[in-house]
Amino acid sequence: MKNNKPPNWAIKLTAIIGAFGIILGAFGAHGLEEVLEKNGNESVWKTAVFYHLIHAVLLVVITHNLRAFSKLTYLFCTIGVFLFCGSLYLLAIFELKWLGPITPIGGVSFILAWLTMLKIKST
C-alpha cells in the first residue's frame, strides 16, 4: 500500500503560508493604510488577503483531511498563493503594472488546484 501522508515540509509550508496571510492582513489594515489609501489600492490588498487565507485553508485540508495527499493539488494551490496573491500585494504597494499579467496565471493555478481534487480517490 502506498503511503499518501503529506511530507513534513508541506505541513510546515502550509503553516507559514497561513501565518503570513494573517500577518499581511494585519499589516495592510494597520501599517500600510496610508500607502494603500493614497494609491487607491485597499481593495486590491483585501482581495489578495482573502484569496491567500481561503487557499491557506485549502492547504490545511489537503495536508490533514484528505485520505490521499495530492501533490498536484498542493503544488497548484501554493503556486496560486505566490503568483496571484503575491502579485496583488506588490501591485497594491508599489503599483508595478507589469505584474498585472502574472495575477491571472496565479488565478488559473488556483482553478487547477480545485479541479485536481476531482482526481483524488476516496478509500
Name each model-derived stretch:
Residues 1-123:
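Polytopic transmembrane helical bundles with strong interfacial aromatic enrichment
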